[in-house]
Amino acid sequence: MKPAYAILLGLFAAFPALGASDVKNGQKLAETHCARCHVIGDFNKFGGIGSTPSFGLLIGMADGFERFRTFFERRPHPAFVSVPGVPRWTDLPPYAKPFEVTPENIDDLISFVRKLD
């Protein structure tokens, strides 16, 4: 794990205690950005990319919520997801529309995903 990501993960771990997350914002983030590759549920149950795990499958994994918390550093996400203060892993242009997430966005997304569980 790159040092900047280790520091960022520590910051993310601290954020849930700071305040309530926004489930509706998490849902909006998932539907806007994640649904282009992942099946989220009834929202796009016939969508996604065939080789990409659905949110339901990810939730069922032993480390599923950790995968959501660290998705921005897991392939292929670093190519198009940016985090403030963390340099991208590559200078190559993103192959999907890039977007930025914050620790609050991650908490919102996880709150939404917990509602799906």
Where does each model-flagged region fall?
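A common structural junction motif
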Residues: E73-F80
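C-terminal capping alpha-helices of c-type cytochrome domains
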Residues: V86-D117
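Gly/Gly-Pro-rich "capping" loops immediately C-terminal to redox-active cysteine motifs
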Residues: D42-E73
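Electrostatic cytochrome c docking/interface patches
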Residues: A13-L29
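Sec-dependent signal peptide recognition
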Residues: K2-L9
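The canonical Cys-X-X-Cys-His
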Residues: E31-G41, L109
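Extracytoplasmic/secreted proteins, especially bacterial periplasmic and envelope-associated proteins
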Residues: N25, L29, S54, D63, ...
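Inter-heme linker and motif-flanking segments adjacent to c-type heme-binding CXXCH motifs
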Residues: G41-N44, K115-D117
